[in-house]
Regions:
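Hydrophobic transmembrane alpha-helices of multi-pass small-molecule transporters
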Residues: 1-110, 227-229, 237-388, 485-490, ...
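Membrane-embedded alpha-helical segments and adjacent helix-loop junctions characteristic
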Residues: 20-21, 64, 78, 82-185, ...
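Structural signature of hydrophobic alpha-helical transmembrane segments
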Residues: 50-60, 103-116, 166, 327-335, ...
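Long, highly hydrophobic alpha-helical transmembrane signal-anchor segments
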Residues: 83-88, 132-136, 140, 217-239
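Re-entrant/interfacial helical elements at transmembrane boundaries that shape
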Residues: 84, 163-178, 197, 210-227, ...
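Alpha-helical transmembrane segments of multi-pass membrane proteins
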Residues: 111, 143-155, 182-207, 233-241, ...
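Membrane-embedded alpha-helical segments of transport systems
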Residues: 152-160, 169, 196-221, 237-257, ...
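C-terminal transmembrane helix pair
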Residues: 182-183, 243, 365-383, 394-509
Length: 509
């Protein structure tokens, strides 16, 4: 949620952007509350007995959760707790001890540690200094300036939530828009303002796919594959796929927005760099806290990439056998503990509990609920049954299925939470892949990548809602820019699968 204080700093009304962009759909929530159990019961009754009672119950619970997630009939994290309540009640062979471990899965601690690192960066304003430094380096050309904002936002959101990155960049962006109005004698350059706002929002979504901690769908995928298919994806391994996609798509999005959809009328922004440098000067010299967080940040990123590579080296692994037991989650928790230990001065440490408690605990519950649901898909044979039903698609070209999955998930995530969409569809997509005799990752990876590519509507993702609330972007303008990026995103996902994913994950497409 965007606080009133943050909006005040951004020059926005006191009403939160989520309220402005997404009014409380009380009627839709009530309909969803009733529709969920009805769909669950209908699905249970319609599915054949050959599936088994366990599979039919799991399908019903999945329908209930998907409906409540889509309509937000209950808060999304509360719906994520349903597996812990319903599976022990409805499945005699399943006890609470079988479901509860999903809420403490390895990947949840990876994200917890990543969140704490991000909170430490925000506490000491390191993320803001890094972003302003990047923007200050691009000059006063409007198109390049928008590119600088996009690079800065995209880089920050690799490590910090895309909502936080957008809120951080928005006040600076609004200040630059105000400067342009001043330079043009009170006349607004509508295209520049729109392109800058959309550039910030879109780069926040695009940059988040680069790392496992950048966006919840990535972490959900890691937990799902580890728990259900014994497939481990390392932090550095994912970056071999995520970073090329993010970099390429950032450039493409920048060109599309600034050259074709909303080309700025202003050719040069005198004073823009002075404004940004003034923001940097107001921050003062880099503090000891910022320096120490920067060191921890670099060590964390290096460890996530280097330790798995070192563990694969026979000479090194024989000399240091414990390296193989150091997972990405272990590194994340080590980083979190270090942040609480390292002193900045006699009174302060890099992270305190008052700051850490702001961690988005609801996202962690959502991870657990998604993993618990997907586990029952496998344990009850529902995934295998889905695979058998789509066996007729065995002769459909792989690229057609990748395309269809990407389009379907991308359209769904325009209307529902990308995390909830991912949690619902991962086991279904995996079942389809098995039915087509394809490696599970062939369809799971494009589904996860597409889940973070929502550009058309304010309700699609928090960054869109935040910039919509700025008053510089209308829904029509967002639709006009977003529809092109959505189309391009589908082909970017396909390109990434064939150019990088096959090589990085050892799958044949």
């Amino acid at each position: 949620m965007v606080t009133s204080e943050a909006r005040g700093k951004a020059g926005l009304p006191a009403l939160t952007t989520e309220q402005a962009a997404r009014p409380e759909p009380t009627r839709a929530k009530l309909i969803g509350l009733i529709l969920g159990p009805v769909l669950a019961l209908v699905l249970f009754l319609l599915l054949p007995d050959s599936l088994g009672t366990g599979g039919r119950i799991t399908a019903g619970v999945a329908a209930l959760m998907a409906t409540w997630w889509a309509t937000e009939a209950l808060p999304i994290p509360v719906t994520a707790l349903l597996p812990m309540l319903l599976f022990p009640m409805l499945l005699p062979e399943v006890g609470i001890a079988d479901v509860a471990p999903s809420y403490g899965a390895d990947v949840i601690f990876l994200f917890m540690g990543g969140f704490m690192l991000a909170l430490a960066m925000q506490k000491w304003n390191l993320h803001k200094r890094m972003a302003l430094a990047i923007v200050a380096s691009v000059g006063s050309n409007p198109v390049r300036l928008i590119g600088g904002f996009m690079v800065a936002t995209g880089f920050i959101t690799m490590w910090v939530s895309n909502t936080a990155a957008t809120i951080m960049m928005l006040p600076v962006g609004i200040s630059v828009v105000g400067l342009v109005i001043q330079l043009r004698g009170g006349k607004k350059d509508a295209n520049f303002a729109t392109a800058l706002m959309l550039g910030i929002a879109y780069s926040a979504s695009i940059g988040s796919v680069a790392t496992l901690i950048g966006t919840p769908p990535n972490a959900l995928m890691v937990g799902f594959l580890a728990e259900n298919h014994d497939i481990t994806i390392g932090f550095g391994q994912w970056m071999m796929v995520g970073v090329p996609l993010a970099l390429t798509f950032l450039v493409v999005a920048w060109v599309v927005i600034t050259r074709f959809v909303y080309p700025p009328a202003t050719k040069k922004l005198e004073g823009a760099q002075d404004l940004i440098r003034e923001e940097l000067r107001e921050m003062g010299p880099i503090s000891r806290g910022e320096k120490l967080v920067a060191v921890v940040f670099v060590l964390a990123a290096t460890s996530w990439i280097a330790i798995p590579l070192l563990a694969r080296n026979e000479t090194i692994s024989s000399a240091l056998p414990f390296l193989g037991d150091i997972s990405d989650s272990v590194i994340a928790i080590a980083v979190a503990v270090a942040l609480f230990l390292i002193p900045v001065d006699r009174q302060n440490r890099l992270l305190d509990w008052e700051t850490a408690v702001r961690l988005p605990w609801g996202i962690l519950l959502l991870f657990g609920g998604g993993i618990a649901l997907s586990k029952q898909f496998g344990d009850t044979g529902l995934s295998e049954w889905i695979g058998l039903q789509v066996g007729v698609l065995e002769n459909v070209p792989t690229w057609v299925m990748v395309l269809c999955i990407a389009v379907l998930v991308l359209l769904l995530t325009e209307l529902t939470s990308n995390t909830a969409t991912t949690a619902t569809f991962l086991p279904v997509v995996a079942g389809i892949a098995m039915g087509m005799d394809l490696p599970v990752m062939t369809l799971v990876v494009p589904a996860v990548l597409a889940a973070s590519m929502a550009f058309m509507l304010p309700v699609a993702t928090p960054p869109n809602a935040v910039v919509f609330g700025s008053g510089h972007v209308s829904i029509g303008q967002m639709l006009r820019g977003g529809v092109w990026l959505n189309i391009i995103a589908v082909f970017m996902v396909m390109f990434t699968m064939y150019a990088f994913a096959g090589w990085a994950f050892g799958i044949t497409l």
